[in-house]
Amino acid sequence: MASNPNAVEQEILQAVNSAQTTDKRKAHEQSLAYLPVEEERGVNVVGSKMKPRYIALTCDDVTRIFYIHRLKVNDKGGMTVVKSWPLFELQNITVINDHDVTMTINKPHLLRTQDTSARDRFVFSVAKNYMYYMGRPLSVTTTDGRKVDWAYRNSFADNKPNLYPAKSLAIPKARSSLPENSSEQVSSSFNSRVAHNRNFSDGPIVTNLETDQPRIEKKLTIDSSRSAKKKLSVEKERRFSDNKPSSNVSRGTPSSAHSDVIEISSSSAIARTSGDRKDDVLFDTSTQRRDNQTREMFIQEQAQLFPSKPSLRKTTRREQAPSFNSGTSSSERGKNSISGSYEKNTALALEAGKYNMSQKDVKLSSSLESNTFASDFSKVDRDATQAALSSSLETPSVLTSSYKPSSSSKVSAKSVSRKPTGAPAIPKLPPKHPSRQPTVRATPSTGKQIEPPNDEPSIGNELLPLFESLRFENRKTTSKPKAKKTLVTSIPTKPHQASVEKVYDLNSKINLKNIPEQSISRLSTLKWNEGTTIKDVLKQTEFSFDGAIISSVENLAEEEIELQNIKSQLQDCALGCESINSTINLFSLELSTALNGVINIEQQPSRR
């Protein structure tokens, strides 16, 4: 190997720049560091197991890409590039001992050096430029997996290698140590956090919006809270025992009793809490006075704006009860909870009474309105209206059924004046059979027919809007009985109609009068025998239909057989085409061999 470092560097640069890159251009690379190493030979190579090589780290001036090159020394002089890798393919470096190191690029490459300091400088340069190029530190470890400290620290300041001066950057330390005053900063920050910590079990901090300072609240200890709970339970039992006789005596007037209880409980609670506030809590009286003034001003403005509307009960209750947000402590909240519960129960009872009274007023007003609105229908029989509503849901054939006339309906004078002068008669449905024709009466004076009366009670004319689809005729009954005339209607006979009628009457309940004219004309054209029925006709049609289907299926089967035959013929044609193709290929091969033989025969005398 060459001993002059500058000469070695020049040879490396010349070899690297003369090598063709992937884009077929001359490289313009600068050498950053190089290391003479001995690399293992292959297993099948006879002779020395190690071969001399150079490992160089370079950077291209144009593309700004870092490379790792492996070079070998030629026998005639100079160097050639054996293998090149971009720096980002380098995975890690493992330091085995003072002489051996492994670089993993897709696979581990064992490199042996005689100069340990040169090896260390090269590894440091690679790690430094890897950090600059990739933005993350390179893994340089020992065989045990421990990090190599000298690969991350600039401990080679006196003997710097040939680094690239333009882009050399300081590598940040992998294990950054804390500054000298770090413990003081940590302790001060911890103390500041502890100073701002607060136990939020008593509730959030209530701040004054004017001064933006937290109000002073006295924290209760666990023992004091337990004693306060015991006192509250004792006072609650005593209050219940004191209030029981007063509530029993004043059952007749519950509202007055509840009001007395409210006044007594609230006054006693305020008296007790006012004595405890001086010792337990220190609060700002100016803010409380200001809140009371604003509340009073709001009540006055409300009274001026709404003079007729009484003041709400909730506002009065809020005025009597002490406000918790204005500076009361948790002990006062517990003491005032009993009086607040009494006030809530009594207020709910009073509001329930008011609601019942308001419901009664609403019922009275609605009843008065209904009386004034429905004064015309006060004399209408309810049973008659219900029967009419039920009859409206039935089929219209009910109207044609015979029944006995009922008594005249009770209708007011106003409803009679609103009765229409006349309405067209309802179209009658045809009966099921000519023998079931109903009897129809006709008056001698007027030739109009009168329908038979209905069994349902008569309906007032004021309910006519409910039966817009059903229209009634003005009925005029006479006191004297008159002779009844039966009118029998019949349909004119057509050819073969009697036989058709017999067939339908035997096998179904269908009436010929309900069948459309087109179907009747179609049936009349058919040739019916005396003993034939619809079932026989259906059987005949089914038999003919089945025969047609069977014939069509047979035709389809025959066509399918023909298609299969055609398919087999096509397959035979394809096989014949393939055989023809193969024979053509054989002929072409024979021709080519024959031509080659002819050409060889012609060339032999020329060579001789």
UniProtKB/Swiss-Prot annotation:
One of its GO terms (biological process) is exocytosis. Residues 176-192, 396-420 have a biased composition (Low complexity). GO terms for molecular function: phosphatidylinositol-4,5-bisphosphate binding. This is Uncharacterized protein C17G8.12. GO terms for cellular component: cell cortex of cell tip; cell cortex of growing cell tip; cell division site; cell tip; cytosol; division septum; exocyst. Residues 175-262, 302-340, 389-461 are annotated as: Disordered. Pfam families: Sec3-PIP2_bind (PF15277), Sec3_C_2 (PF15278). Residues 243-262, 322-340, 436-448 have a biased composition (Polar residues). Residues 212-221, 232-242 have a biased composition (Basic and acidic residues). InterPro entries: Sec3-PIP2_bind, Sec3_C_2.
